[in-house]
Every structure is written in C-alpha cells, then in structure tokens.
Amino acid sequence: MKRKIIVGSRRSKLALTQSNWVINKLKENYPAFDFEIKEIVTKGDRILDVTLSKVGGKGLFVSEVEQALSDKTIDFAVHSMKDVPSSLKEGLVIGAIPKRESPLDCFVFNQVNALDELPHGSVIGTSSLRRAAQLLKHRPDFVIKPIRGNIDTRLQKLHAENFDAIILAKAGLARMGWLENTTLKLEDIPPELCLPAVGQGALAIECRESDQQIRDMLTSIHHEETGICVEAERVFLKKLNGGCEIPIAGFATKANEAVHFKGLVGNADGSIILEAEQTGANPSEIGNKVAEDLLSKGADTIIQELRNI
C-alpha cells in the first residue's frame, strides 16, 4: 500500500501556494505518492495587533508546525526560510532547500513610481526592524508605521490606511504570480540599500531526522548552491543569537567555488549600522567570521540594548 504524505503548512494564501509548489515538484519525481496538505495556525498568525518584535521569542510561524512533525501528524513542513529559527526542535532537520527566489525586498507604492519620488515625511509600512533601520539610515525623514497581516492583507492596507509605500519580500509576490500585475507600482530595493533577511527568498522543507524515506524524497528538490548560501547566513544568525526583535541582515552569494557573505546589525532608528563581509570556500566559516567581526565592532552591545527595551 502506497504511503500518503501529509504536508504541514500555514493557511495563508502564500504559504499554501508555496506548499503546493513543493508538492508539484515532488509529484514529478514521485508520481506514485499521494500528498495532502494539513493547515496549521501558528502563534504569529493569531497575534496580529502587535509587531512581531514586541511579541518576542523565536519560531513564531513555525513552532506549532514543528510540534505537528514531532507528533507525527504531518510528514514534512514547508516554511519560508526567514521564519525558521537558527536552531531546530530536537529530532527535526531541514531535508531540502529548493532553488531560491529573489532575495530582495521591494517597495509597493501608493501614488508615486520610485523611491526618489517619495516626498519628505512619507509614511512607510513595515513591521520589520531590519527594513526600518536600513531605510531610516537612507531617509531619516520617513515615518515608519507597523503593518501586519498576510501579503494580500498588506496590499489592501496600502490604500485603505493611506501608506505612501509598503515594503514586501519580492519572493512572495513572485510566488503569488503578482509581479506581472500591472496595477502594482513596484521597485526593487537593492541590497546596498536594504540587505535582505537571513534566508529570504528561500524555502525550508523540514522533516523528522529519523524518517529516511521522506529525507530521500526531499533530496530530489534540494538546490545545492542555495543550500550553501543559506548555510552561511544561518550560521551567522545563530552566532549572533538573532531574532525578529533585532535589526539583523545577512546575504550570501556563490561564484565558482567562493562564497561571499555580507552581514549587518543595527539599532532601531538606523543611526548605528554595523557591517562586515567575507569571501571564502567554507560557508560555515564565512558566516561565523562575519558574526565575529560584527561582535568586535560592538554588535553585542546593540543586541543587548534592544533585548532590554
């Protein structure tokens, strides 16, 4: 009797789109298997009236899903990598990281068509301290206003709540098929202006360490280059013990055999932004070295001050 594979997913449109994309990829390689999605509501989905940095803790969008894995009510889970804490629940592993979508953030404008057209004092919607800090460094005149909800909810709020612009991950728009939407006024934010979050644009497929059949299956959709880059980023995040309450960014690229990684830590208003970068062959070493460079520049002081607020 063939095994039915139960896939854990948050119930947002984006999460379900991502989970179905993974299932369709696996069906190409394993047509004999049946797949079924089990929708799971997480703490981050339930708490919508405060920013994630104020909720605190790690794994706000994954803890309940990981519990379902441990309880064996699902066989694997599909996460946005940037939501996955640097340390997984015991007994769980990341079984595959498919090829990364765009890692960039992007502006979605209300009236104008470009960042340079936004007037003094424009109201920008983002609940990400990472985005806010880097944007305020570039444009301290901006007023940052928190915005929560799924990607479609935030797009509705752009007009309903009179934001001049909101910031979204480009990967989410791409996976929803909305980059081709001619009614959206979009502009990519280059990493020089806003370095992406660790793992941004990548998916994490998490499973039980002991489930060899699922692990073998997931290997078929793993993308080696993405995995190497994300490894550097996540080692960096773990070294700094980062979470959503700290403006931390990290982005790696690979060319030939070399990994280039840039990391950043800042304070909430962008008045202090510390940066470091390294290039080398070993992604773990590179991630660690960049974290150590930032700690030597005073990142630990910034992190501690933000945690004590």
From Swiss-Prot:
It holds the Pfam family Porphobil_deam. Pathway: Porphyrin-containing compound metabolism; protoporphyrin-IX biosynthesis; coproporphyrinogen-III from 5-aminolevulinate: step 2/4. GO terms for molecular function: hydroxymethylbilane synthase activity. Keywords: Porphyrin biosynthesis, Transferase. InterPro entries: HemC, Porphobilin_deaminase_cofac_BS, Porphobilin_deaminase_N, Porphobilinogen_deaminase_C, Porphobilinogen_deaminase_C_sf. GO terms for biological process: protoporphyrinogen IX biosynthetic process. It catalyses: 4 porphobilinogen + H2O = hydroxymethylbilane + 4 NH4(+). The modification S-(dipyrrolylmethanemethyl)cysteine is found at C244. Binds 1 dipyrromethane group covalently. One of its GO terms (cellular component) is cytoplasm. Its cofactor is dipyrromethane. Tetrapolymerization of the monopyrrole PBG into the hydroxymethylbilane pre-uroporphyrinogen in several discrete steps. Belongs to the HMBS family. Monomer. This is Porphobilinogen deaminase.
